[in-house]
Amino acid sequence: MTALAPSSTPLPAGRRGAVDIVKGLIALTKPRIIELLLVTTVPTMMLAARGWPSSRLVVVTVLAGALAAGSANTLNCFIDRDIDQVMRRTARRPLVRSVIRPAEALAFGVALGVVATLLMGFLVNWLSAILADAAIVFYVGVYTIGLKRRTPSNIVIGGAAGCFPVLIGWSAVTGRVGWPAVVLFAVIFAWTPPHFWALAMRFREDYAAAHVPMLPVVAEPLVVARQILWYSYGMVAASLALAPVAHVGWVYVAIAALLGGWFLAEAHRIVQRVRLGRDPRPMRLFHMSISYLTLLFVAVALAPYLP
């Protein structure tokens, strides 16, 4: 195991202030990831309602969904605290620096999950609560414990956990899981590998040092680039398939096609640069993938209002 970076030195036991603890607990929930998950929830609710649903329903669903995601992320940090010490990208996480103790993180993660379940069940509906719990179990049990350290397919299968917000959003409005939600699930499912493999290409040495078999660690760069490209095509196809399933109009189709072409051009660029032996600059695709998903779901939100 490599040594911790100087900036990651654990805090002395007596130097944990209340502010440090609060900030540490918030950091464990990975707020930026929660933001991205919620970007998909509200537009899905708007599509299901064919407009703006009840504001109360939106607020409660978003709050409970954020707590559920925070629970999953906190438990992920608790389980992965050993490898987080090895990776430079994660070396400043609260558990690594002893800002938060493992027992505190575990209790906090479980508490968030319980509160999320009760809020979702009593104030939204129990199908949405079950889906939120399924997302937590899938992310923590299937991905973090079962797949992450064992197979290069970890993010392909485990990434399904990040697709649950669209199912939750749809069921919150309709009380069931409709086919449009399934199609949006497929969009995010296909989006996840290019997004995370681009990140893993950039931090390949980190994952290798932690013995996490991400695809860029165990496969040749050209294999990774081609896989990114194929999943990107699947993502774009799924985004266009929403049109006949959800009865959205030509404006959504045009936006989805333009965004898809933009994304595919970048995926092709990575393949080409790898073939030429150049730096693929994968973080361009990583950041682009966030913009792509955000803009696509803005189009989903506006679809009920557009021709």
Curated annotation (Swiss-Prot):
Gene Ontology molecular function: protoheme IX farnesyltransferase activity
InterPro entries: Protohaem_IX_farnesylTrfase, UbiA_prenyltransferase, UbiA_sf
One GO cellular component term: plasma membrane
Localization annotation: Cell membrane
Membrane spanning stretches: 33-53, 59-79, 106-126, 127-147, 155-175, 181-201, 208-230, 245-265, 285-305
Assigned keywords, A-Z: Cell membrane, Heme biosynthesis, Membrane, Transferase, Transmembrane, Transmembrane helix
Catalytic activity: heme b + (2E,6E)-farnesyl diphosphate + H2O = Fe(II)-heme o + diphosphate
Pathway: Porphyrin-containing compound metabolism; heme O biosynthesis; heme O from protoheme: step 1/1
Membrane topology: Multi-pass membrane protein
Gene Ontology BP terms: heme O biosynthetic process
Keyword Iron-sulfur applies: no
EC id: 2.5.1.141
Enzyme class: transferase
Function noted in UniProt: Converts heme B (protoheme IX) to heme O by substitution of the vinyl group on carbon 2 of heme B porphyrin ring with a hydroxyethyl farnesyl side group.
NCBIfam families: cyoE_ctaB (TIGR01473), PRK04375.1-2 (NF003349)
Other information: Carbon 2 of the heme B porphyrin ring is defined according to the Fischer nomenclature.
Family indicated by similarity: Belongs to the UbiA prenyltransferase family. Protoheme IX farnesyltransferase subfamily.
Name of the protein in its database record: Protoheme IX farnesyltransferase
Biological source species: Acidothermus cellulolyticus (strain ATCC 43068 / DSM 8971 / 11B)
